Amino acid sequence: MAPTLELLAEDYASEEDSDFAPETAEAAGESSISDDDDEEAGEDAEKAKPEKRKRAAIEEAEDAGYDNSGDEAIIKKGEKRQKKTKTKLAADDEETGEGGLIKTRSQRAVEKEKRSTAAASGPVTIDVDALWAQMISEPVIPRTSTAKPDESADPANCDIAKSSSQQPETAKAKDPDSDLIKIKRTYNFAGKVHTEEKLVARDSAEAKLYLASLGENAPADGETAAEDESSSAKRMPRKAFRSVFEPITDANSAHRSDLNLSMASRLQAREATGNKAKKLNTVEKSKMDWAVAVDKMGLKDELELAGKSKDSFAARQDFLARSEMRREEEARRARMAQAGKT
């Protein structure tokens, strides 16, 4: 049997056999290999699906405690998504390097060291301790509102700046109330009693007229004079009603005139005030009105200049008076000379 089989194998021609097909056998082998790969991939996918389902179930269990219809659940889900994306990007950066290459453990350790070292590697040029000691040792400079003039500039400008800075200080040093005078007067004019009380400038025409009306013995402060005038009208307050615990005396039982508020008492008080008030004539009232008008229109300086000039009315009156005196002197001399001849 063996020799016959060997003879048949020697006489067999594979090219003449119609059933012999080596290409189909190779294709069948390749297809079997690809089928095996597909089966392995399918098994991996089937393994991954349960893991995804488990993750989804865990997330649903975590979200079960929140009200999914409110804003808190939506915000929580958004934060989870952001956290997942950040962790995924960080993992991709750590695992992959330039050109898509996978990093080794040593490369990852070197990158972590670089991230952790935030201090400057160069030389430090500022000594913080010395700077702090210098700041503490310097004296505290008080803050001034006025700027100091530059000494390197023109000295004339420096003098102007100093004088302008000293002017407000001198103005503050002066008491603003010292330049004012209080006018308080009561006068009777045209059958009516007028009472005035106001503050005017000390150098005004009205103030000068008021001080001149008080006389030579008038005090320097007009307010003191006004208080002296009204001191007689002031009275100390007294009790309106007597207490039940006070002893009954003649002084307490006397009638209180200051509590009489009838019309007759008011008229009597007005008459008493009118009798005490100074009666002014037309000339004196005109002087007062003229002084008020001069201060109101600001004619004081102009009137002073006009009064000092030669063309003023006062100067002309003085000239006429001197001329009249000279004529009278010449006439007297002529009479004396004529009497001596006779």
UniProtKB/Swiss-Prot annotation:
It comes from the Eukaryota. Residues 260-341 form the BCNT-C domain. InterPro entries: BCNT-C, Swc5/CFDP1/2. Residues 78-87 have a biased composition (Basic residues). Residues 8-20, 33-43 have a biased composition (Acidic residues). It is found in: Nucleus. Residues 1-126, 142-178, 214-238 are annotated as: Disordered. GO terms for cellular component: Swr1 complex. GO terms for biological process: chromatin remodeling. Keywords: Activator, Chromatin regulator, Nucleus, Transcription, Transcription regulation. Belongs to the SWC5 family. PANTHER family: CRANIOFACIAL DEVELOPMENT PROTEIN 1. Component of the SWR1 complex which mediates the ATP-dependent exchange of histone H2A for the H2A variant H2A.Z leading to transcriptional regulation of selected genes by chromatin remodeling. Involved in chromosome stability. Component of the SWR1 chromatin remodeling complex. This is SWR1-complex protein 5. It comes from Neurospora crassa (strain ATCC 24698 / 74-OR23-1A / CBS 708.71 / DSM 1257 / FGSC 987).
